[in-house]
Amino acid sequence: MDRVGKYGLFIKRISPKDADITKESLETVNNMLVFLAEKLTKQANIIIDQKTLRHDAFLWLLTDIQGELGKHSQDFANSVLYGEKELVFPTKRTENLMRKNTCLRISQSAVKTLTAILEYFCGQIMEASFSQAKKSKRKRIRPIDIEAAISQDKELHSMFGKGVISGR
């Protein structure tokens, strides 16, 4: 069973307590996180040589993100690296995803940093989607809510763009 980049169970743990999420929405958020991980690892490989991948490259890439999203995700990643916060997402799945797309030598701090970035972005997506579902007087997050939340949030829209979200 190939579990590379499957975060469904952990996305449920990050979602707001009084929210419910459909299966299609879980797949959508999971696909968005895998897209983000692949995008960041490709950019990090361009910055650093192909031999090793370190966490500095990911933190440097976060400075290019517009607005407060990059700054806050960088703070979250640093707090995870220095042991101030615990991760919910598994680092092994992120490491396998990185190995599939990049070089063979990856530092553990790079894995932790990327996992923290994915977890932070997932939390932001879930928060925005739940507030969008609340506006529609629903407790269950659907793919429409995710799409609307991303299109309304300027920073998330700059990261994910107008991607096709299935399950309408």
From Swiss-Prot:
A Pfam family assignment: Histone
Key words of the record: DNA condensation, Host cytoplasm, Host nucleus, Virion
Gene Ontology annotations of biological process type: chromosome condensation
Induction, per UniProt: Expression of viral histones begins 2-4 hpi and continues along the infectious cycle.
InterPro entries the UniProt entry points to: Histone-fold, Histone_H2A, Histone_H2A/H2B/H3
Main location: host cell
Subcellular location: Host nucleus; Host cytoplasm; Virion
MF annotations from Gene Ontology: DNA binding; protein heterodimerization activity; structural constituent of chromatin
A single Gene Ontology CC term: virion component
UniProt KW Lyase keyword: no
Biological function: Histone-like protein that is recruited to viral factories during viral replication and participates in viral DNA packaging and virion production probably by forming unstable nucleosome-like particles. May compact the viral DNA.
Protein name: Histone doublet miniH2B-H2A
Organism of origin: Melbournevirus (MelV)
